[in-house]
């Protein structure tokens, strides 16, 4: 994918109509460029909104597959020193802090990473960097920090409190996320302005590894590398038994694991279902923690996620059946004919996405890894379409490409972050994963999202030309970062105050939750307006 600025310049032709540069290219159908710019703008905005619906659907599938990956345990057999009997326990394969950074944050940031890396490989040998550009990354960071916090804070039910259980890990992740953008400013404005050297690219990528090590050290409370902070209260059970709400009179029906959003909400609303990404385990004297997981033995694990007498292929087949079914079991219970018609229309709107995403294998294959990888590929594909729509919106409307970069494009590439954090805020008992995904995604976008493409290009340019990589789309970076950090302070201060006064970062009294949400959205609007005025030359 070329830079948004380069793509917009390619899309704009020299012919002018009434003083406006006419966009001659098309994306949806041939002959599209013969339509008026106003009509095309409406079509592109509708297409962008439809892509957001698709991103929401596939991100939910991604989150479900990640649940299966993270909850995987391995059997540990020990001998009782007194009775000499075998004691079988199960130890979690994944550390939940590492899972938040390397699976959740990396996965939701995969659109930026994959598209930028493919662009770097496709344009290898170019002396100027392409990709999303620094402006989009700062805009994406602002979208992650403000609108996603605004959504997550109102997700818990009225009066329900969800707080960060490990403040030490959160502080480590927060510092690394802010440092990522300070580092971006240093290498683009101070160290070697508008130039990326091989050393700078290598150091950028290595810092992702340092983030993982430092966060893990804090989680394990390693001396000299961790903050002396205690953990908060955690649930007694890691994965409580789920209540099967899908049972009806016909026990032989295949369980609908590809259920609609309404059914998903009903099931996730039950407090008998808990996700376990960031509920950290306490250390014992030996430094090893064992968990007895009730659903890990082979017999029950095989049954989990599918009904009696059903197979994996039955479930996979049922995904396609559900994709073309307009009336669900839940909608049949609705008495109002108007609500049933509205639900059927919504299912019709979702049908193309559901049919496409039905190709994602069931999440209980290979502990969820295959579904995890398939989901990432689909997320990247939809994100690519988002970038094309945003390019064309800039082209037909004449909106400054930089404004599009840190608004529509940043929102599109960060949409999976929003959906994943919202689901985590709904289904987990703490706020750890929901907020960790915000801060860690911002880190991943810099250390990996542009670090890897820069490393690919700088290595080639160093050996081929003995030249560095040049950056030409860093306009307004200093000002945008200044506004970002200023508004970020306002966001973090409110989160801390909520912790001290209300007792949690998310939830609480409904009025205060909505006021906090409105405040976070106001900070985002301030960032967007001031950055837009700066790149437009108004201020």
Swiss-Prot record:
Q: What is its main location?
A: membrane
**Matches recorded under InterPro entries:** CaCA (IPR051171), NaCa_Exmemb (IPR004837), NCX_ion-bd_dom_sf (IPR044880)
Q: In which tissues is it expressed?
A: High expression in leaves (at protein level).
Keyword Membrane attached: yes
Q: Which UniProt keywords apply?
A: Ion transport, Membrane, Transmembrane, Transmembrane helix, Transport, Vacuole
Transmembrane portions of the chain: 38-58, 98-118, 135-155, 167-187, 195-215, 341-361, 365-385, 392-412, 444-464, 477-497, 511-531
One GO BP annotation here? transmembrane transport
Q: According to its UniProt record, where is this protein located?
A: Vacuole membrane
Membrane topology per the entry is:
Multi-pass membrane protein
Q: Would you name any one GO CC term?
A: vacuolar membrane
| The keyword Zinc is annotated on this UniProt entry | no
| Family designation | Belongs to the Ca(2+):cation antiporter (CaCA) (TC 2.A.19) family. MHX subfamily.
Q: Do you know which PANTHER family this protein is assigned to?
A: NA_CA-EXCHANGE PROTEIN, ISOFORM G, SODIUM/CALCIUM EXCHANGER
**Main role?**
Vacuolar transporter that exchanges protons with Mg(2+), Zn(2+) and Fe(2+) ions. May control the partitioning of Mg(2+) and Zn(2+) between plant organs. Could play a role in Zn(2+) accumulation or tolerance.
Its recorded name reads Magnesium/proton exchanger
Please report the organism this UniProt entry assigns to the protein: Arabidopsis halleri subsp. halleri
């Amino acid at each position: 994918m070329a830079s948004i600025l380069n793509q917009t310049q390619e899309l704009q032709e020299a012919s002018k109509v009434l003083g406006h540069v006419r966009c001659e290219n098309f994306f949806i159908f041939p002959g599209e460029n013969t339509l008026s710019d106003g009509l095309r703008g409406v079509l592109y905005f509708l297409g962008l909104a439809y892509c957001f619906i698709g991103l929401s659907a596939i991100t939910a599938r991604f989150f479900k597959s990640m649940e299966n990956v993270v909850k995987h345990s391995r059997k540990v057999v020990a001998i009782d020193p007194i009775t000499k009997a075998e004691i079988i326990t199960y130890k979690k394969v994944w550390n939940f802090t590492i899972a938040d950074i390397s699976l959740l944050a990396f996965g939701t940031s995969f659109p930026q990473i994959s598209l930028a890396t493919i662009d770097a490989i496709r344009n290898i040998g170019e002396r100027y960097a392409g990709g999303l550009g620094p402006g989009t990354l700062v805009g994406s960071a602002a979208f992650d920090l403000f609108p996603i916090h605004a959504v997550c804070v109102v997700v818990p039910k009225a009066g329900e409190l969800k707080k960060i259980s490990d403040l030490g890990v959160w502080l480590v992740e927060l510092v690394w996320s802010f440092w990522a953008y300070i580092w971006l400013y240093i290498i683009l404005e101070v160290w070697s302005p508008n130039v990326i050297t091989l050393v700078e690219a290598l150091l950028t990528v290595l810092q992702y590894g340092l983030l993982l090590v430092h966060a893990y050290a804090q989680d394990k409370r390693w001396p000299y590398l961790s903050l002396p902070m205690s953990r908060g209260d955690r649930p007694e059970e890691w994965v409580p038994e789920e209540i099967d709400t899908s049972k009806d009179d016909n026990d032989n029906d295949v369980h609908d694991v590809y259920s609609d959003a309404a059914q998903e909400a009903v099931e996730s609303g039950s407090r008998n279902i808990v996700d376990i990404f960031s509920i950290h385990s306490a250390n014992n004297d030996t430094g090893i923690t064992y968990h007895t997981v009730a659903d890990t033995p082979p017999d029950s694990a095989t049954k989990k996620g599918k009904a009696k007498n059903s197979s994996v292929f039955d479930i996979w087949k049922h995904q396609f059946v559900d994709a073309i079914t307009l009336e669900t079991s839940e909608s049949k219970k609705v008495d109002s004919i108007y609500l049933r018609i509205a639900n059927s229309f919504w299912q019709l709107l979702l049908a193309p996405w559901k049919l496409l995403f039905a190709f994602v294998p069931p999440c209980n294959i290979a502990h969820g890894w295959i579904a995890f990888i398939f989901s990432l590929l689909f997320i990247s594909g939809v994100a690519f379409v988002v970038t094309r729509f945003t390019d064309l919106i800039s082209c037909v409307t004449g909106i400054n490409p930089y404004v599009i970069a840190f608004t529509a494009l940043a929102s599109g590439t960060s949409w999976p972050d929003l959906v994943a954090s919202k689901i985590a805020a709904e289904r987990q008992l703490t706020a750890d994963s929901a907020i960790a995904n915000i801060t860690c995604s911002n880190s991943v976008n810099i250390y990996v999202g542009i670090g890897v493409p820069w490393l690919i290009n700088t290595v080639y340019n160093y050996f081929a030309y003995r030249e560095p990589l040049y950056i030409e789309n860093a306009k307004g970076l200093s000002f945008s970062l200044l506004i970002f950090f200023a508004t970020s302070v306002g966001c973090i201060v409110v989160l801390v105050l909520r912790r001290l006064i209300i007792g949690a970062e998310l939830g609480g009294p409904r009025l205060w939750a909505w006021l906090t949400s409105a405040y976070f959205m106001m900070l985002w609007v301030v960032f967007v307006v001031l950055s837009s005025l700066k790149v437009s030359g108004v201020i």
